[in-house]
Amino acid sequence: VEQGLKKLAKRGNSPIVGVGFSQANALSAAAQAYPEAQFTLIDMVVPEANVQSVVFRAQEGSFLVGALAAMKSESDTIGFIGGMDIPLISVFGCGYEQGAKHINPSINVVHSFVGSTGAAFANPSKGSEIARSQFESGADIIFAAAGSSGNGVIQAAADMGKLAIGVDSNQNYLQPGTVLTSMVKRVGEAAYQSYAAAQNGTWKAGFVSMGLAEGGVDWALDEHNRA
């Protein structure tokens, strides 16, 4: 990835856009090697003088899906499963609970976490196990912010006739009829805005925050969950 980014910079491309934690180190190295180039990193922060770091206010999108969960729940108990109990993930759970309680102040929101290391985001079987426990305890909808561990949550919901909420990208298609909706980060919109800013001369390095007002987060409605 680093060599690819450096090649783009050497050819004069600008801005050069990367996405996520996995590209952060490579983009940082490329930005240091080509200080005259403009780089944009989406969904992660790199403190280089020529990097624009775009982060999403996930709590705002999570508030929306929490409200939807409260409207749909028949048991008045819903669940949240995060990968790790860290601030990056806690904002999803907090926004989700606030949205749910905005609709139903007495709703019960159960919070669980898959693990305490990065592996927690890549353990679908553990995600499924925790989801089954939450469902058996009375939850009828679970929102997972746990990487691929969330796939296990969605599978458990399908197996048990319950509902799940996807995260980051539109996961409605994974189990149509089981995925109530997905809290999406609109990475494409973030990239478009970065390119547009460069085109009209308003691109700036530093920190950019995108929430509902900027079109950065949303909930997914499509043919898989419209009914």
Language-model segments: what does each one mean?
Residues 1-227:
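A residue-level marker of the well-folded mature domains of exported/periplasmic proteins
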